[in-house]
Amino acid sequence: SIFEQLARCKALIVDDFNPEDLNAYGATILFNLYELRLKRKLITCFTSNIKKTALENPQKPKDKLLFDRIIANTYIVEDSSHNYRKEMDNDFE
């Protein structure tokens, strides 16, 4: 299954992670996948525009368990450099 392939690959990158896009089912699947990868000691990298404070204080109860697990098991690197995506969006307007 796709889930098992994601659970076994050496490194998984969850790009542009945004919990607003997840329903309760999606949050549960992602939590289970991340938990399994942690047990297998596999690399999982999340990229996101979410600030650390938002991870520490989720607005929705469904996000708390996943966010707590991410915070407890990751290095959070905040990049406050120039937002090139926003600049590109403005070029197309």
Predicted feature locations:
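Short glycine-rich substrate-engagement loop in P-loop NTPases that contacts/grips substrate
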Residues: 1-11, 21-28
